[in-house]
């Protein structure tokens, strides 16, 4: 396996949405369930629901700092490879391990980001026939550098890897793509 460093630099804001809230054993999911099970919610209940959704959607590393997980970056690259009809090749030929720091100007911890208020995106989403307001972390300008391992038996060369990454940048990463999460590669 060869290793190459890719740098993603934002063209559009990144909206995060981790799968934590789908896990019924996750503490954030349990807290959200308690709040949403209430029939009559107060204003402060709605604020707590928003906060729970936001924290549950944020990708953080072991130090509590925003990051992009390897599996998210890898899935993004696989999506980019599909433009060249190389989706299955990329699935078998690309590996991104670990969490990679999200680079941005602003507060660095989840609590500071929440308190700042500038990293909150509230928008209506369709669930079945209903429209419900959801809260997500948003990063207006961001970058991420990470290492990708690639199999030279499947990915021809580094040039093909960069073509795949540039294609991924047109599709974007995170929630509500391709409008959000678009990036350029260096």
Model-derived regions: residue spans:
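RNA-interacting cores
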Residues: 1-186
């Amino acid at each position: 396996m060869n290793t190459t460093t890719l740098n993603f630099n934002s063209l559009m804001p990144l909206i995060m949405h981790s799968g934590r809230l789908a896990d019924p054993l996750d503490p954030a999911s349990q807290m959200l369930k308690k709040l949403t099970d209430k029939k009559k919610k107060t204003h402060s209940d709605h604020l707590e629901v928003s906060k729970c959704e936001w924290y549950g959607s944020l990708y953080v590393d072991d130090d509590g700092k925003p990051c992009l997980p390897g599996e998210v970056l890898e899935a993004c690259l696989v999506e980019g490879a599909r433009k060249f009809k190389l989706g299955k090749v990329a699935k078998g030929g690309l590996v991104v391990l670990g969490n990679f720091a999200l680079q941005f100007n602003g507060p660095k911890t989840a609590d500071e980001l929440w308190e700042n208020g500038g990293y909150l995106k509230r928008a209506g989403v369709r669930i079945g026939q209903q429209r419900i307001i959801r809260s997500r972390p948003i990063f207006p300008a961001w970058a991420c550098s990470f290492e990708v391992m690639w199999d030279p038996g499947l990915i021809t060369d580094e040039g093909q890897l960069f073509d795949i990454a540039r294609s991924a940048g047109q599709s974007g990463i995170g929630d509500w793509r391709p409008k959000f999460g678009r990036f350029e590669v260096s």
